[in-house]
Amino acid sequence: MEQHGGSSSQKPHAMCIPYPAQGHINPMLKLAKLLHARGFHVTFVNTDYNHRRILQSRGPHALNGLPSFRFETIPDGLPWTDVDAKQDMLKLIDSTINNCLAPFKDLILRLNSGSDIPPVSCIISDASMSFTIDAAEELKIPVVLLWTNSATALILYLHYQKLIEKEIIPLKDSSDLKKHLETEIDWIPSMKKIKLKDFPDFVTTTNPQDPMISFILHVTGRIKRASAIFINTFEKLEHNVLLSLRSLLPQIYSVGPFQILENREIDKNSEIRKLGLNLWEEETESLDWLDTKAEKAVIYVNFGSLTVLTSEQILEFAWGLARSGKEFLWVVRSGMVDGDDSILPAEFLSETKNRGMLIKGWCSQEKVLSHPAIGGFLTHCGWNSTLESLYAGVPMICWPFFADQLTNRKFCCEDWGIGMEIGEEVKRERVETVVKELMDGEKGKRLREKVVEWRRLAEEASAPPLGSSYVNFETVVNKVLTCHTIRST
């Protein structure tokens, strides 16, 4: 690649590419905005499937971008289906591994052949899009990976190979699964009293060629080649785990929560702050509804972008909320219920019409959680949701669905003291009891005090000039991302 003339060529240009799922897109977009605030030209790359979904949900001009923050797309090989269709995880994984490298490199070369923008000087990639490492090495530019889950999840994933070698996974059969999941694993650094049930749930497979296990090994086997690895966490939350991780991957930097850095550094009324990439249409009425409610009176319910409930489960949640007598705001997105999105019975809707609001789409979760009316969060324990709830000072009721959400549940409820368990099997009586306890009980009060303390520590980590996340972010920006000189190749 040739360096372009003119002052614009001296401006660093970050190519940012998330894994194409909502929970991965959100933190990457925040990271891209933070780089833009530090003077980077940013190209944000979506795959075709999600590019179309964003245009459907946010309108035809949603991806126009700004002169120094542009959106591009690469083909992903996925068929175009209904905009609200649930993405097939295995197809998504297969398509990114097999289809994205060549068009990604072609995009970089095309951008570098123009004269209106500086050449791409670094790649910021989701760790799950590890083909970008090959592109960076070929083009001789640094690549920083973003790990969008917790540091704890990463250290567990890094030991999946050892679980296989010790013949702990895959299971021989699933006949005694419950007993097997109680197996204590005592040989992972910084992990005390952790059981298989607390691992991301791919450990339950009986398939020696399980594609998710293969994908985990594929990703964790490649990340050591990255120039640096960002984790959206902060030192005091996962201190011991981060120390252990750095003995395996010295280039790890805790730089979260991104939400705090974004709030500190980017004006809320700026054009860059307004850029969004939600895959579902976002409603705007919930905040007005919350304005009519008393402080900490409402429980917010959202199971994330990938959770699929059975009709029985959603009915148990519904009647548990009804029986609690509490006001609630519940996101019931399209595709959330297996087979029937309109399963909520008329009796439930009638009984709760004056104290419940249902959102049939998507909402600005950060704004909802930070609203004074929110007193609790019934959540699937996705990592973004966990950090957003922590930052808002809102305690959680934890009902994980899959993957690292089970790990997050364990640490929220047992180690960090910010969550309550609802149990794997959903029963309306249990939902009622836990909601009441969180909103009104002594345990709920203790959790609320603890989460407020964690929020204070998160803010300390993000504060200049000496906060750990602030210093780590500055270190990578200055020593990895902006020190690279484009040379002819």
Swiss-Prot record:
Gene3D superfamilies: Glycogen Phosphorylase B (3.40.50.2000). Its EC number is 2.4.1.-. Expressed in roots and shoots. Pfam families: UDPGT. It is an enzyme of class 2 (transferase). UDP-alpha-D-glucose binds at residues 305, 363-365, 380-388, 402-405. GO terms for molecular function: glucuronosyltransferase activity; UDP-glucosyltransferase activity. This is UDP-glycosyltransferase 85A4. Keywords: Glycosyltransferase, Transferase. Belongs to the UDP-glycosyltransferase family. InterPro entries: UDP_glucos_trans, UDP_glycos_trans_CS.
